Amino acid sequence: MAESDGVEFFANRAQSSMADNKNSVLRCTFSAPSHSSTLLRGLSALRDQGQLLDVVLAIDNERFEVHKAVLASCSDYFRAMFTGGMKESNQNTIELIGLSARGLKHIIDFAYSSEVTLDLDCIQDVLGAAVFLQMVPVVELCEEFLKSAMSVETCLNIGQMATTFSLSSLKQSVDAYTFRHFLQIAQEDDFLHIPMERLTFFLQSNKLKNCSEIDLFHAAIRWLQHDASRRTVASEVLCHVRFPLMRSSELVDSVQIVDIMVEDVQCRHFLLEAFNYQILPFRQHEMQSPRTSIRSDITSLITFGGTPYTDNDRTVSSKVYFLPDITVRQFKELTEMEMGCSHACVSVLDNFVYVVGGQHLQYRSGEGAVDICFRYDPHLNQWLRIQPMQESRIQFQLNVLDGQLYATGGRNRSGSLSSVECYCPKKNEWTNVDSLKRRIWGHAGATCGDKLYISGGYGVSVEDKKTLHCYDSALDQWDFKCPMNEPRVLHAMISANNRIYALGGRMDHVDRCFDVLAVEYYIPETDQWTTVSPMRAGQSEAGCCLLDKKIYIVGGYNWHLNNVTSIVQVYNTETDEWERDLHFPESFAGIACTPIILPQTTTQR
């Protein structure tokens, strides 16, 4: 009997356990997708039928009967009012101030329907009520509507709403739209009433699109002349117009005839500054100010010259190409130089490009080296011939250090050079400084901090192709630093992130030349070289520059193919990766390139 009872006990336990497991397996959660909308319709019906209403909101002689629970569930303002122990929680009628009846009606309708109907007539009332009552979804819908309603006619009013209600996302959209359409907006009557701070915000920006300085001047004058009391702030407004970048005829015919430009002392100074800037081109470097900066926020890659290295033609290119910005994968022709060149060196000082030396006819040796120097003004698209170097140079280096240009080494018909020349823009003259410790050509150079570094090239011995020289302008002295790991000639150097990268080039072995694919960087503080990802294809005698933390190597000669190339390899200094999906319009060696800020009208054409 006892054994039978035990069997029955365990059988019951097992059956119970199976039932529990079965119930556990079958336990599921279901949802009705339409429940939310059904609930809202039900609450709206109760409101329409006047059932279970428990509070009245009074505003502007209008009364709205509602359910506390509905408003508290979707508004932080009402939740705090009805549940936070405030006196209104026990009142049957609550007087509201700080918003309009029309705005409140839209908010209540949204609470019961999740929908809001907006137009330009009611938007300010609805947005004001939504912000006041902390109805975030309605605020977001209002922002969405206002962004879609943006136009030349509405932009300024929408901007005022964005400022009033501290809507940063909407303000950014308004600013972006205004930058694109500023001149059209400036013709609107609303423009005459914008605050001065708002006007100067736009006038000082580099983001304005398709705006000439003379057009911006006319817009500013229109705003100033609308109210006579504004004359006292004329200089605070007009200081953001870049008079030095206007044409001389515009200054004479359109600017100096405006009375305020003559009567206001500071405005008269702006006019004088512009005239001085234009008649003294060699002193423009010392007159730099925000008014002399090109109005653009995009840095472009710009190239000069090059040679196809054809045996039957000594022609070199006079074309200047540019890559509008890093998102555009195609070079465009910008202008032409006064004469063709290859293997020239370029450097940028105050956004002027100096194109120095090189050759105007193709020679494989230094026989074609020239001493001619030009300065290119990208704003006016003008060339200015400056004082020539003391020696003709090709396959040398040109770098900016302490506001001056340094031309180092190279070769000419007399042979290789050790001399170093320094150009002073203010004096427009070249002077000799401490020479390199040996003759050298085909080297590379870069500045980092307050020092100039020269690496590799053809010197006296094989070891010279690995040598690193460092120049201290304060001491006017050259010193040797840690040599590179790889011997290189006709390579490139670029300074980025406090590192100096050595890239590409070639090395010689008996009667053959080989591409150097290895890439390494030098850290001045530690005097050490570190190897990074190699190039995918060889490039020597190539253009090289840094743009947006990426190193661009343009064209050059590939010794594996034994020919010039159009390839553009791009090295990301942050990820240590290479890209190769870009090509120069022509297969050239001896291209010079540099990053520069071009006018908006140039990059957008």
UniProtKB/Swiss-Prot annotation:
The keyword Repeat applies. It comes from the Eukaryota. Residues 53-120 form the BTB domain. Signal peptide: none annotated. It holds the Pfam family Kelch_KLHDC2_KLHL20_DRC7. Kelch repeats lie at residues 300-351, 352-403, 404-450, 452-498, 499-549, 551-598. InterPro entries: BACK, BTB-kelch_protein, BTB/POZ_dom, BTB_POZ_KLHL26, Kelch-typ_b-propeller, Kelch_1, SKP1/BTB/POZ_sf. CDD domains: BACK_KLHL26, BTB_POZ_KLHL26. Residues 155-256 form the BACK domain. Keywords: Kelch repeat, Repeat. The keyword Repeat applies. May play a role in endo(sarco)plasmic reticulum (ER/SR) mitochondrial signaling. May be part of the ubiquitin-proteasome system (UPS) and affect ubiquitination and degradation of target substrates. This is Kelch-like protein 26. The lineage of its organism: Eukaryota, Metazoa, Chordata, Craniata, Vertebrata. The gene is klhl26.
